[in-house]
Amino acid sequence: MKIRLTDIEYPFVTAGTVFTFTGEHPFDKEPVDFMLCEYHSGKADRCEFAFYCVSGYHSGSLEYVLPIEAKAQGTVVAVSTQWLKEHWKSHVYGGCKACDVTLTNWIWDQNEKYKSNTKE
């Protein structure tokens, strides 16, 4: 099952989530997969997450280390969904908008629990 990044109501995503989009140069014009991975850069202005390309010719390449502002609030070790929605094109990958990104390998049951707990 896939879901668009912009359709996610859950406040964060965790390591192992795969983000799929249609690539442009330097990627092939076919689906590109970025996986959110833990990455401890040791720099104060970076959080402990990065995107690695996990498809095609660039598979295994480190693509982007996320800034500290991307970290989800609270004690959870995750990335803010809102930050990704707002900064996908400007920070993560400039070749597409957040509405063109789909997620797979995401924690669906937590999303359903979150939805049911936030309804009045």
Give residue ranges: language-model regions.
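Intrinsic-disorder/low-complexity loop/linker signature
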Residues: D7, F27-K29
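Short coil-to-beta transition motif at edge beta-strands of beta-rich domains
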Residues: P11-E24
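Basic/aromatic-rich interaction segments and small domains that mediate binding to polyanionic partners
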Residues: K29-I68
